[in-house]
């Protein structure tokens, strides 16, 4: 395929047009008075959203050179979303500001490489200043504030802080669509896995169709149990203790299952059998997790263990187990806390080294099951369009909250960027590197300017007053008042704030140092097929 090539100023100006189109579309959503953007979908109702990365991903421009500029900014939003989970609109605004100021200087004859070095040095200084201004997030109220700011809903803030309190910072919090109109929180404490009882005759509550075992022993094996004789010695020993038994095995079939069911119905023995969760190597890992959580041992050929030789000492224990037709929940396992902590540390290191998104997600689920539980926020709304928009906001809020717990918070509303201006201005750089520093100084003002503009105020006036105010004082665009931002609950996670700036500077520098752009030539429209002469007979 033939290529179109543009050089120097012509190449950069084409890309900048694309940057501006995308950024101008996204930045109207910034701040508490940010507007919505309506996205046409190929089927179903349009999506109404103020989520920066969702909007950025939808934009495709006809001009190939402009589209490349737009896609680079979209990459900034996506990367910020991947790292911090929020701050995508801020990252887009910062990218546009750095590109706009940088292009003026490059066009005037400045060396783009020198400018790039200056930008990198200024951003590094700004990031260090942001980190030093950080306030740790330690209590439930602070977590609720972070979530409320991101989602623009105090109720959502309460749900997220409650969920994190219940399942811990490493716990799994999932967001699902509710069947009703109300948003609600459902917390499953303990370890849950998606395997239910193998026979409905094992239930202890016929009305709810669940089996509840109090203080049970837990047999954990990756073997298939077909012959009851294999576990008979173990069953006889458990029978003497008068305690129930949960069997987690590859499968229970043959004569073993009906024998267990018969003894359960007769009241001889309270037992529930479930299949082991997962598949392949993941199944082995999950069985090991269950064993560590409950203080048991996995009966497996890998360790040279046989079912017929198993003793009560090899069984796990828990305060309660609940099993329904689809899932099993183990509450308060009797495992050694130190062994559990070591297992958690191993899984965390696997998450960090994993390159697969799917593997990382599964490892995160295992981590949550070991360290707390699972919380589900069920989102309710009057219409499908509102539901989609609400779900996106809650996802952003959850990500922002996790980021806040990780690295702390700073004043929100763009104030944190104004508070680091002095640190950046104190950086002694000369020539084009000094120009790069000045570009960052101007760009750091842009989020506040845009938030004020979206709320109907003059950005320059707000910035001038901010520069002369005490550190921590900022402009509440929602009310038009000047307040202590952290005390007023207007806060941003440091991780979000710094990621937005770092990613914006990285991509903007690439655009400024671009000297040639290569794009595919548009394909010529195929000519209409010639008409069959026989079709013209009636036209004479």
Swiss-Prot record:
Gene Ontology molecular function: any one: unfolded protein binding
GO cellular component entries: cytoplasm
PROSITE patterns, alphabetized: CHAPERONINS_CPN60
UniProt keyword annotations, A-Z: ATP-binding, Chaperone, Cytoplasm, Isomerase, Nucleotide-binding
Main subcellular location: cytoplasm
Binding-site residues for ATP, renumbered to this chain: 29-32, 86-90, 413, 476-478, 492
Reactions accelerated catalytically: ATP + H2O + a folded polypeptide = ADP + phosphate + an unfolded polypeptide
EC number: 5.6.1.7
Pfam families: Cpn60_TCP1
UniProt feature coiled coil, ranges: none
Subcellular location: Cytoplasm
Highest taxon in the source lineage: Bacteria
Gene Ontology biological-process entries: protein refolding
Enzyme class: isomerase
Stated family: Belongs to the chaperonin (HSP60) family.
SUBUNIT field: Forms a cylinder of 14 subunits composed of two heptameric rings stacked back-to-back. Interacts with the co-chaperonin GroES.
HAMAP family, alphabetized: CH60
Function recorded in the entry: Together with its co-chaperonin GroES, plays an essential role in assisting protein folding. The GroEL-GroES system forms a nano-cage that allows encapsulation of the non-native substrate proteins and provides a physical environment optimized to promote and accelerate protein folding.
Name of the featured protein: Chaperonin GroEL
Primary gene name: groEL
């Amino acid at each position: 395929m033939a290529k179109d090539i543009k050089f120097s100023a012509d190449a950069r100006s084409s890309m900048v047009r694309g940057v501006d189109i995308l950024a101008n579309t996204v930045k109207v959503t910034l701040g508490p008075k940010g507007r919505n953007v309506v996205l046409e979908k190929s089927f179903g109702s349009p999506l109404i959203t103020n989520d920066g990365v969702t909007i950025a991903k939808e934009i495709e421009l006809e001009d190939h050179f402009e589209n490349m500029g737009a896609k680079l900014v979209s990459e900034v939003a996506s990367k910020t979303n991947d790292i911090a989970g929020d701050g995508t609109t801020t990252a887009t605004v910062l990218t546009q500001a750095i590109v706009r100021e940088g292009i003026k200087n490059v066009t005037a004859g400045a060396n783009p490489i020198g400018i790039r070095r200056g930008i990198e040095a200024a951003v590094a200084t700004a990031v260090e200043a942001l980190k030093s201004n950080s306030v740790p997030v330690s209590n439930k109220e602070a977590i609720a504030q972070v979530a409320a700011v991101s989602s623009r809903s105090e109720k959502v803030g309460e749900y997220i802080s409650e969920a994190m309190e219940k399942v811990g910072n490493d716990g799994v919090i999932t967001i699902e669509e509710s069947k009703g109109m109300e948003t609600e929180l459902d917390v499953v404490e303990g370890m849950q896995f998606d395997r239910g009882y193998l026979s409905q005759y094992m239930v202890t509550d016929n009305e709810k169709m669940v089996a509840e075992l109090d203080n049970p022993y837990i047999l954990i094996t990756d073997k298939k149990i077909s012959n009851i004789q294999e576990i008979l010695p173990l069953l006889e020993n458990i029978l003497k203790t008068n305690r129930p038994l949960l069997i987690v095995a590859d499968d229970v079939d043959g004569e073993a299952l009906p024998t267990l069911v018969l003894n359960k119905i007769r009241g001889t023995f309270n037992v529930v059998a479930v299949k082991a969760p997962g598949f392949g190597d993941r199944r082995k890992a999950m069985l090991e997790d269950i064993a560590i959580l409950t203080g048991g041992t996995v009966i497996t050929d890998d360790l040279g263990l046989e079912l017929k030789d198993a003793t009560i000492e090899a069984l796990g224990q828990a305060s309660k187990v609940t099993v329904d037709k689809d899932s099993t929940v183990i509450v308060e396992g009797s495992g050694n806390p130190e062994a559990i902590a070591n297992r958690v540390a191993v899984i965390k290191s696997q998450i960090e080294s994993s390159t697969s998104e799917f593997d990382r997600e599964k490892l995160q689920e295992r981590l949550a099951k070991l360290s707390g539980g699972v919380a589900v926020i069920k989102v309710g709304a009057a219409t499908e369009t509102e539901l989609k928009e609400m779900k996106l906001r809650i996802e952003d809020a959850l990500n922002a909250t996790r980021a806040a717990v990780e690295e702390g918070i700073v004043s929100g509303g763009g104030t944190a960027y104004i508070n680091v201006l002095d640190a950046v201005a104190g950086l002694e750089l000369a020539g084009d590197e000094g120009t790069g520093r000045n570009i960052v100084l101007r760009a750091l003002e842009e989020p506040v300017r845009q938030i004020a503009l979206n709320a109907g105020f003059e950005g320059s006036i707000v910035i001038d007053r901010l520069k002369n105010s005490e550190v921590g004082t900022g402009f509440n665009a929602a009310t038009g008042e000047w307040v202590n931002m952290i005390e007023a609950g207007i806060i941003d996670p440091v991780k979000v704030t710094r990621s937005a700036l770092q990613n914006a500077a990285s991509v903007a520098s690439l655009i400024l140092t671009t000297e040639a752009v290569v794009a595919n030539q548009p394909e010529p429209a195929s000519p209409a097929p010639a008409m069959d002469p026989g079709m013209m007979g009636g036209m004479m």
